UniProtKB/Swiss-Prot annotation:
It comes from Shigella sonnei (strain Ss046). SUPFAM superfamilies: MFS general substrate transporter. This is Ferrous iron permease EfeU. Residues 1, 56-69, 140-147, 201-244 are periplasmic. GO terms for cellular component: high-affinity iron permease complex. The keyword Iron applies.
Length: 276
């Protein structure tokens, strides 16, 4: 439940910030009449992401067992790529995202008789990018942790992001976004490492990867996945009490370079914003 909550909080807050920045800019430049048009783009993006997520989730339930495992592995790999890209992309563009959005709004509203649709599509693509990232991660998360709690966590995270977005827009709160994105990014890298190890496990169960399947270690006597804490670790970080050598290797092969890259100072002009 916690991982879907955190991911949807972060992704939802990114989308909320985009919408808030666009709405604030429209009001500040005496173009508040276009805010309704902006919301059309937001709703279309939300409908696309929701529909795509439901379609993929319902379709995969019809797959035979091996194809189901293969699909789970592919979705996990896609989720790892998206999460990693999300972390480092936000590091790179967060300082300039406000200027970029304002320039995009100006460009959209200068396109003659079609500027309304241009604004709709600009907002649609900006919000849909965040939503599609969430779709693939949630598909991977729901496959690893079944039941009602992961969807509930995702909905709570999204609801919290919406509330925070409105509070930021109205000026009711000031949030240290630099610290928020820094620590959630670090957490997400550990989540992605667990997904990468889970992808190897899924490919093995699909019959595609049968190398280094010896048990690396057995922690069942110390931290069983049947215990409360073990269950939490499994749901959050993909913890396995008796992982294979290949799972452990993939976990380290992904996580060590990712942490090193994350620890390096961002390039000039790409430092994170401090607050909003």
């Amino acid at each position: 439940m916690f991982v879907p909550f955190l991911i949807m909080l972060r992704e939802g807050l990114e989308a909320a910030l985009i919408v808030s920045l666009i709405a604030s800019y429209l009001k500040r430049t005496q173009r508040g009449r276009w805010i309704g048009v902006m919301w059309i783009g937001v709703l279309l993006a939300a409908a696309l992401c929701l529909g795509l997520g439901i379609f993929i989730n319902e379709t995969t339930g019809e797959f035979p067992q091996k194809e189901q495992e293969l699909f789970e592995g592919i979705v996990a790999v896609i989720a790892v790529v998206i999460l990693t890209w999300m972390v480092f992309w936000m590091r790179k563009v967060s300082r300039n995202v406000k200027v970029q959005l304002e320039q995009a709004v100006d460009s959209a509203l200068q396109r003659g008789n079609h500027h309304g649709w241009a604004l709709v599509m600009m907002v649609f693509f900006a919000v849909a990018r965040e939503g599609l990232e969430s779709v693939f991660f949630l598909l991977a998360a729901f496959q690893q942790d079944v039941g009602i709690w992961p969807p509930l966590g995702a909905m709570l995270g999204l609801a919290t992001a919406v509330v925070l977005g409105f509070l930021l827009y109205w000026g009711g709160i000031r949030l240290n976004l630099g610290a928020f994105f820094k620590w959630t990014s670090l957490f997400i890298l550990f989540v992605a490492a667990g997904l990468a190890a889970g992808a190897i496990r899924a490919f093995h169960e699909a019959g595609l990867w049968n190398h280094f399947q010896e048990i690396a270690f057995d922690m069942s006597a110390v931290l069983s996945t049947h215990s409360l804490f073990g269950t939490l670790m499994e749901g959050i970080f993909g913890y396995q009490e008796a992982p294979s050598v290949s799972e452990v290797a993939v976990w380290f092969i992904y996580l060590i370079p990712a942490l090193v890259a994350f620890a390096l100072p961002p390039r000039a002009g790409a430092t994170a914003s401090r607050s909003a």
